[in-house]
Amino acid sequence: MSPRINELLADLPESEYQILYPHLELVSLSKGQDLFQLGEVPSHVYYPAGAVVSVMKDMEDGFSVETYMLGKSSLVGHCAFMGPSYYRANVRSSGLAYKMPFATLRQLVPLCPGHTQAVMQSLGRMIAQLSQTIVCGKHHSVEKQSMRWMLIT
């Protein structure tokens, strides 16, 4: 399977893809697996290639809320650029992903402006979707909310 199944990698200029490719490792992610915890700086970033990863916010009372899902159009672990994670990344649906050490990606960023732009666009989509989720939760029925989640994944 080619790493280009991940849309973020698929859209890169060939020159940037060739810079990143040698550092990608295909891994199998298991449902329920935590990729990193709240407050940790992720050691790796993941480019999902079938797996779906939930962004989880754990509450002090032990309750967890899924705030976002990341799939083949995303990068998991982008929060490492900002420091410790503000969420827990939990595998919601088993599948494959390509991983890369974050330290490696950080070194390669100056050589890959297209990748940086793609990550920023992905973050913009995430913010837009989170805003829509808030509106949906206040305005739509549970059935309509369920349909939105199915369309996302």
Question: Predicted segment positions?
Answer:
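Residues that recognize and position ribonucleotide moieties
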Residues: 10, 27, 46, 68, ...
